[in-house]
């Protein structure tokens, strides 16, 4: 009892510091940090028990737990410091030099005298801080739940000293910093740390002369204040006269903590009507004027608020720095436990709760939950109970806290009254209560004293008011009040409806499931938790009424698809019946334009941005009850696979903790419908792989496909994988590429593959780095098991010297080289597709012909233009750019934009190093020269991971739109249509003519299409399948109109079917319209013409001559599926052949009439040198069939036998069909 009393007094002192109203883990654990450690042997005994509780591996007696924490969680700690910047050494510091102090601080919990110093960085409770990025000029069309700024790259992690650093885009120092985050995540803690750091001379001394901290819940108690009175309240001791303080407003910082808590509307007022700083005015008006910059416009502000409150609270605050608090890293969670319990070193306790720790560690990323858990453990120790931590949810933990702190059931009536007080305060947005408020509610004096003593309530000495220990605790009590209401009077469905209406009125439909009260309410409606409530309140609840209330809350119209808040609520509830019923009815596709704010325009694939371990845990938990068949946790740089629908893709930009991996894989033990899991690009530790393989061995796991590309796996992980393969009968496909498994690891995999229980049919791994012996083993396995296919498409795992940006030689890992060099099967394109830059043409490589994926390496800074595609890049340094040809139908289908916008150019999927490209010119085919199209109607559509964004280009030129400082994703130009104009948009078009010879008969195909390189390429490939060859002729000179029809005619009597062509846009994946023209004898040539059907004016004419045609090509044999990846001999040795063929004319003579037409023959011969002739010859070889290249090879053998023999010996074979 004495210790409890001491702790209550300590809590009171905490409340007095900086007007603290919430439970602050920083202050709760500071005592333990500052206390001298004595008797290391006894301490080690206690800490040994603690590490058992936390699931940490044992260590030798001479190693302190602080060191163990540092060593075992180095990766988590490293990440929490990855964005750390050096402090400005010019800061004025009153007590020593910060950089020296900071650098001396080790990544551990020191047991030395230094812990007694009051330097900030030695007693900070570290929080993960994410600075959000909101790209300017972007109009977000899609958001999941409400992410007011879904960053393209997730923002970046920062430290507390970076809060007021200049914006990366504008280089301007922010005047407004918004600290946002979930309930209990540590926003107020951070705000108080900033104030205390400034007071102690640790932060911002060079920028701010005065820092004022205000608790908005206390300010709301004041009806009117003058600016002078506000400043006086914001300082414990007034350091200067008000007039002097206000003389330099740019040196002032106002911290407004919990600005979303009071029920006020912050209204700005006309600057001309602003009163003098000594005159009083309504508080909400005063604060509104500060925010609106009507008064002290040069001053800086820091606000804290829950993320869900920002949208309606402050709709127009310009461009603030937005920083989201993500809670504790895993290291800091364990660190917190150590600090909290360090004072208990004289207590010997048996901990036996290892099994539930991963879930609890994940819940404890929220500092308030950390405090709650530690308080429960402490109460159990004080009461001599056997420690029991079976709680899987925050709701269960709160009930455990109540059962441990409420002294018997005699307080149940007063506890009900306290719940009513909490609910009334939540509805009225009140968190401070006077003594009379408590008495009016029915709380007795002795009950108030008891609640203060056990820490549920706390007194505010400055205002003589009371509050709950934390706002989350008040919201928990409010949730209990809704349960208790119905137990007193069975109101049935009407009571349920009234409860739901009250919740909607308080939180709004948009944010209903984000509200902690609603989450607690769903958690309390769990069967187990309701029984716990019955024990606490000594009553029985009407179960049927509770079930109806449950369904009315999660039912329509409030339930939003893929809403993170709903996932949280379902996780808190944990009822399998409700989870299955809700998730199986979960809409996975957009049902119309009204869902544009909540869904993504890609059917059957849902995308969610998750920022924390907690969000990952609740989402994966709920997914296992849904129809989702494929789950991807997107990592960086991973290869994309096509997922089986319905699918879900989760995006996260912060590392995943070990505890979270364990929880995620635990959820996979019973997957119901989930069959595919893609973790590629996410680093997996040894213990994470062990947890994954343990889950895969469970009978309830139905995963059939597992992608682990570039997950940092080593040979040490292969024993778990092999054991899983031997035991898991469902896994059919496993991808382990870009992992350093080595010979030993692959041998272990072979053992698993030999097991008769293994049903794996596809295994992908890197074979180039393996020894011949291991490769032989793999081939033997394939031979023995015909169903097993082992594939590899990546380069060798070797470390080779490369040159870094400073000109120094460095070692590049095999994985980096694979990402830089790509696939070993590369084909050089002809010069028609080259990028022309400062140093001349730069060749483009084919990475994957089937996927239309290409790569170009731009060697230096400058401007590069590709005439074939119309793309233009301006780069600041050497950079490799990947370009994929896409189809609009794949992305734009079934979106509202298909009715309001028209496609205006090709769609490209471009990837480049961030910051290397300062401008990109995207081609469009809308004709601006007609003067009928306003350039402001042009937009660039970005199809990003989290949805689609429309961006306004910097300028629009006749043939392209310019984006400056672009971010890349599938992107292309759209034109907003005006109803009055309709389809009468002038466009630039092209004609494509193809022919095929059969004896003397000729068949032509004539196309009229928009000038889109992706359409042209699709037509080229389709015609080549039927041995049609393109003839290049000039396009129409004038702009044409979509929907117009044109008559096809000829100067000779020929067969034309159909005789009309309509100019229309069709996706490259669709069949294009063409006219087929049959000519019996071309003679000296024919004229083809296109005439506008409506106005009968000639719009295009071309003369086709015999010299345009080549003899009939040999028929191509059917190639195997892997033929596109197989290079012909002449393509493999292109560079050698160009350099070493010394006699070209005899070679041309052998190709003349078989491969080369008369015109081609003369064109090649006209080049000046042998090298130029060979380059010209290879340029034309792009359209050759495999058989034509065989003819080329035979001609080379006859004219240059020694050269061919030399190349054959070096290559070990020849890729030809004989």
UniProtKB/Swiss-Prot annotation:
Biased composition (Polar residues): 1-29, 799-815
Location of region: ZU5: 835-968
Domain FIIND span(s) in chain numbering: 835-1118
Enzyme class: hydrolase
CARD domain sequence ranges: 1122-1211
Site (Cleavage): 968-969
GO terms of biological process kind: activation of innate immune response; antiviral innate immune response; cellular response to UV-B; defense response to bacterium; defense response to virus; inflammatory response; intrinsic apoptotic signaling pathway; negative regulation of cellular defense response
Broad class of where this protein is predominantly found: cytoplasm
Keywords assigned: ATP-binding, Cytoplasm, Hydrolase, Immunity, Inflammasome, Inflammatory response, Innate immunity, Leucine-rich repeat, Necrosis, Nucleotide-binding, Nucleus, Protease, Repeat, Ubl conjugation
Pfam families registered for this protein in UniProt: CARD, FIIND, LRR_6, NACHT, NLRC4_HD2, NOD2_WH, UPA-FIIND
NACHT domain location: 175-484
InterPro entries assigned: CARD, CARD8/ASC/NALP1_CARD, DEATH-like_dom_sf, FIIND_dom, Leu-rich_rpt, LRR_dom_sf, NACHT_NTPase, NLRP_HD2
Binding annotation for ATP: 181-188
One Gene Ontology molecular-function label: double-stranded RNA binding
LRR repeat copies, ranges: 343-364, 673-693, 730-750
EC number: 3.4.-.-
Subcellular location: Cytoplasm, Cytosol; Cytoplasm; Nucleus
Region (UPA): 969-1118
Swiss-Prot/TrEMBL site (Trigger for autolytic processing) positions: 942
One GO location term (cellular component): cytosol
Family that this chain belongs to: Belongs to the NLRP family.
Domain-related comment: The leucine-rich repeat (LRR) domain may be involved in autoinhibition in the absence of activating signal, possibly through intramolecular interaction with the NACHT domain.
Complex and partners: Interacts (via LRR repeats) with BCL2 and BCL2L1 (via the loop between motifs BH4 and BH3). Interacts with NOD2; this interaction is enhanced in the presence of muramyl dipeptide (MDP) and increases IL1B release. Interacts with EIF2AK2/PKR; this interaction requires EIF2AK2 activity, is accompanied by EIF2AK2 autophosphorylation and promotes inflammasome assembly in response to danger-associated signals. Interacts with MEFV; this interaction targets Nlrp1a to degradation by autophagy, hence preventing excessive IL1B- and IL18-mediated inflammation.
The protein, known as: NACHT, LRR and PYD domains-containing protein 1a allele 5
